Amino acid sequence: MALLQWMLDHVQDEEKNYENLSIDDQHSLFGINRDWLSFLQLSKLEITHLKHVYKLVDNDRVHLTVHPSSDNVHAWSFLCKPTDVKVVILGQDPYPDGRGCGLAFGTVKECSIPESLKNIFKELERSIPNFSPPDNGCLNSWCREGVLLLNSIFTVVHGLPMSHEAFGWQTLSYKIISRLSEQMNSLVFLLWGKHARKLSYLIDAQKHLVLESAHPSPKVKSARMPFIGCNHFVRTNLFLTEHGKDPINWNILNE
């Protein structure tokens, strides 16, 4: 008990030194859209933690190739406003080969389509009428439909998957998930793979629809909850329609 009290007192003393930054200051520091920063209401402690994360990432950029580029790390925040979110698809970390664009599972147009995304397109083609797989992995138009494509870790060193897992990006990604769960109603959360499914505790399943399956990577074999055949895209639109929201036009990638 004495140790616990010391820790509480220490945290309170330390917190006095944490910076209280305006939304504009946070935007300049972190490159996150102001609408999201206003929505998230980051605490002084969270801001301090994030500044440390950025310092670690910047240090790596000095002598290593880090993906995505600084300008694209938070592309998700500019393509889908918090008030427009209807669906959240959770990813892990960016593609370590440079194809990532700041959106979970998405790529820049010029790059080849990763195998995981090919499987996502397969499930769409199987379950959504008239869906035709596009010839690139750019998912920007889904964001404008209200689909938040969010990685839990926002950067990665080239060729080293999960290399920034311990940097502390979860301070931001977990806050985004929990804040959406608290402040919004009738969202759909798609959790694909063990990493994403572990975050279900952040979501109020009484308010939102949480759909889980194996990761779409063809390397993952799951008899219990396979990705192909999960019908998540169909079930998502049924839920949205039942709750008075417009369904997602998954076909918009080809329009």
From Swiss-Prot:
Catalysed reaction equations from the record: Hydrolyzes single-stranded DNA or mismatched double-stranded DNA and polynucleotides, releasing free uracil
Catalytic center residues: D93 (proton acceptor)
Top-level EC class: hydrolase
Keywords: DNA damage, DNA repair, Host nucleus, Hydrolase
Disulfide-bonded cysteines: none
Keyword field contains Hydrolase: yes
GO terms for biological process, alphabetical: base-excision repair, AP site formation via deaminated base removal
InterPro entries: UDG_fam1, Ura-DNA_Glyclase_AS, Uracil-DNA_glycosylase-like, Uracil-DNA_glycosylase-like_sf
SUPFAM superfamilies attached to this UniProt entry: Uracil-DNA glycosylase-like (SSF52141)
Compartments, record wording: Host nucleus
Any GO molecular function: uracil DNA N-glycosylase activity
E.C. designation(s): 3.2.2.27
Function (record text): Excises uracil residues from the DNA which can arise as a result of misincorporation of dUMP residues by DNA polymerase or deamination of cytosines. Therefore may reduce deleterious uracil incorporation into the viral genome, particularly in terminally differentiated cells which lack DNA repair enzymes.
NCBIfam families per record: PRK05254.1-1, PRK05254.1-5, ung
Protein name, UniProt field: Uracil-DNA glycosylase
Chain's gene name: U81
